[in-house]
Amino acid sequence: MPGTAIRDIAVVLSGGGINGVLLELGFLKRLRESPVWPRVGWIYGTSAGALAGAMAAQDRLGDLEGFLLSLRAEDVFQPRRLWQLPLGGLHDYALPETMAERIGDAAELGSALAAAEIELVVFATDVSEHVDGDGSRHFELVYRSHTTPPDTMGRAILASAAVSALVLPVRVDDVIATDGSWVRNFPLEHAYRNPDVRAIAAFRYLASYRPSDVAFVQRMRERLDRFRAVPPVRALLAELRLAEERAGRGEPAHYPELIVRLMRVAIARNTVLEERLAADRETSVLELQRLREEIVTAAVDAAPRRRRPALRAELDELFASARFPFRHDRHVPCLIVRGTPGEDGLDPSFRAEPPWPEERKRALIERGYRLADEELARNADFLTREVGKGRQGPGQAVGPRAGGRSGPGEAGA
């Protein structure tokens, strides 16, 4: 592959919808201006992170910014007519056609990524009909741009971003795939398990949600009220009133809202567990290194002088050959930027109204840039720390938590 830079850093991008991809663009723009960027060899992304990562891997952040600034809600998920909803989902998936017109179709995107120096790794959820009881199936789909056929890779990126609460899944070769956030919203583990990765820079979108909007239920009830003498309409009006009462108590007004809430729970939980696993593993690595140093030093000091070199070699070999379910010969500095949309957040429900103002999009990009800049300033020695040497103090942001611990490992997929 072209280029002479040593590429030993991974970038990890979480899912996050329209707000997440704008924040991630700002984060990536700041990384590109830093000493981190020439060393980036891999981008691991899910959903919004897959889209941002696809453009970043090609060094097309300017094109991504132009694309996002011109993007309307209906360019991503086109609302469907009421009579279509029961069988076809709430929206049509318009993003593939929009991207084909403005950026390139799936095959073109995959071909460009195959030739890029930076490898993109994206994640989707397998929702194929599996009728056999396979206890080892984890439903995670992993696609790597340097080994996946271009057309497949392009469709995998689109599948990763197909929000399940809004649209039907996408076929990728012989698999039915959808939003990767269900199984791997923040793919830290995969980056850590890559033996060539020496450091990780990541962005995690912290979602916030607006109160449920039941105005459409009220409007429907008001329109139907004049037909309340008709028995079926009267029964429907009673159900609509019950839905409004449930909403007033903070309960899901209707079944689709329950599914949306469960989706949020699943995504938030797998993200939190990903970081927790990362922190636990890195703590184990650092403690094992400390224990190894103390045991070897104590044993060698107590041995006869002539025996010390051989004993040290034997003990080092013993520790090195130990089998653990994670790499224990190194720790990986991991800088994580976390971002919320704040007051400039766009409506993530992809309704056509209100529109997405350009000034708020620019504010989100700037917010992501600023958050990255602040984190890099707090960790000015991020790339100069010795990997695998000593212990990190609680004030050093080298791990899954800003302010203290290092990153995780790649699940078998």
Pin down the residues of each PLM region.
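Patatin-like phospholipase
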Residues: 2-103, 134-145, 150-158, 216-217, ...
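Active-site-adjacent alpha/beta core region of enzyme catalytic domains
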Residues: 10, 84-211, 320, 325-340, ...
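Short acidic/His/Gly/Ser-rich catalytic and metal-binding motifs that mark active-site loops
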Residues: 76-77, 131-132, 211-212, 343-348
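C-terminal helical/tail subdomains of lipid-metabolizing enzymes
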Residues: 270-413
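Short amphipathic alpha-helical segments that mediate assembly, nucleic-acid/protein binding
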Residues: 106, 213, 233, 255-256, ...
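Acidic, Ser/Thr-rich peripheral helices and adjacent loops at domain boundaries
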Residues: 216-287
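General structural feature for long, well-ordered alpha-helical segments within catalytic domains
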Residues: 23, 60, 64, 95, ...
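Short boundary motifs at domain starts and secondary-structure transition points
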Residues: 1-4, 111-113
